[in-house]
Amino acid sequence: MRNWTKFLAGLVAGGFVLSATAALADEIRVGITMRMVSENGQKYGQMVMDEIGLINEAGGINGHQIKATLMNDECKSDKGVANANKLIFQEKVHLLIGSTCSSVSLPIVDVTAKAQVPQIIPHSTNAQITQKGSAWVFRVPVSGRFYAGVNAKYVGENIGKKIAYICAADAASQNDCDAMQAQMKSQHGTDPAYVAQVQEKEVDFRTHMQKIKSAGVDGIMVAALAETMARALVQSYEAGIGPDVRRIGSSSASNAPVPKIAGDAVKGVFYAAAYSDADTRPVARLFNEMVRKRYGIHAPDHDFSQAYDLIRIVEIALNNAKVSLTSSSLKADRAAIRDAIAGIRNYQGLASGPISFCSDPSPVCRD
């Protein structure tokens, strides 16, 4: 097991982590901004850095080393934008990876579009990210627009149509709540039985849970980041809402902090996610074992798998990009990397299906 003390301290401080390689004149510079305020979040960032380090150890990209710079945006939009500006204009990165939270990725899309820097998303699911029409953004994770359709079909057919909603204020959760309600209306003709808008880091759900209990619902959807979701699940049982009322989670229910914090309250929660550690494919078994050995995570979630797939896609694109890597070629090199990512076709990794991109700046090409 690694000694994480110095690494974690640097991330909490919000500063730079050591680069994956020393500065070189013909290096490929990659900037990364992610939410690293939890143990899992810190390990997502470390895995990305470790994988880039392994690429460098194997000879790099067409003989060029990758200089990776990792920053912690704490899921705060202002910090994410500041990180992006620093990485783009001071570090002069060729490619930006980020962020974890949709509320951070959304404003960064405007920054990268204006600066003409390719941006690839590791975790954010808010559908608006690729609806902005930016020619510079790509998304590896499944868009929230797809989750909503799947969730609503299952819920309406197997749980019931009288659903209450707890919606946290972060952009991904807001999108998940809105999309789920729209899909329940479209597929089953039903309106929400109850909707509660809560803070991103809400700690007290008791009043809402009492009202939901009185409403006699079939299910409760909790759309929130992992820690907030876990608290809501626990308090739903404390309010006396029995297991016959199904709990429905947004995709963050797959994140390790949820069962760790919620304990028995997580039992029976329905959610859709892009990856499961129960996947029996050889590639998934190898990945699960790697994450367990390196990072001590027994059940890797889809944020681990999506970050890993992202690095593999970036590796392919960088190898295919025709770059000069001189002081005067930065603009052209950024465009070449953007075009190489757009050229990715049928990447087969940890996701349940192939990942492809294309040049049109639309959700069809960029999700």
Please state what every model-predicted region is.
Residues V17-A25:
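Sec/Tat signal peptide C-region and signal peptidase I cleavage site
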Residues W4, L8-L11, L24-D367:
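Extracytosolic ligand-binding ectodomains
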